[in-house]
Amino acid sequence: MQGILGVFGAAGRSRFAATIAVVLVMCGMFAAAASPANAQASRADRLAQYRAWMVEAKAMYPYPQTIDKMYRVMMCESSGNPNAVGPQGLYLGLFQYHRGTWGGRWNPYRTNNIYDAKSQIFATAKAWSIGMQSHWSCYYITAGR
């Protein structure tokens, strides 16, 4: 009895072994990409991007609070998760917008996806620039300006 690979001959077995080796290497690469260390790096990169967008948004929509204050509110509201869904599914995204608030005429980003992180950051800067800080309970429980 030759075994299942015996029917391929030496050349076929060699190609099969090479294919398996490539698959195993690729699986290892994907496993490395999904490792906790890489997940932490990508989270850190994402949070750094959010802070950079906050700088841009504040330049476009000046408000009196610091960028650190906006960052703290975001972390309080969603822990930096753009796909966060609050209790009972009423509040969504980085800054936990209610769909009714998000769709308000004040919001130039209202036609964008409510889960879009950049849109939420810019909408929040716009909201703060027109005095809507009271819409976030985390605004009052995070320290500093």
For every predicted segment, state its role:
Residues 28, 35-80:
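Export/targeting segments at the very N-terminus of extracytoplasmic proteins
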Residues 1-47:
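N-terminal prepro-regions of secreted/extracellular proteins
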Residues 110-119:
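A short, structured beta-strand-centered segment in the mid-to-C-terminal lobe
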Residues 49-52, 65-72, 92-97, 119-127:
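Extracytoplasmic/secreted proteins, especially bacterial periplasmic and envelope-associated proteins
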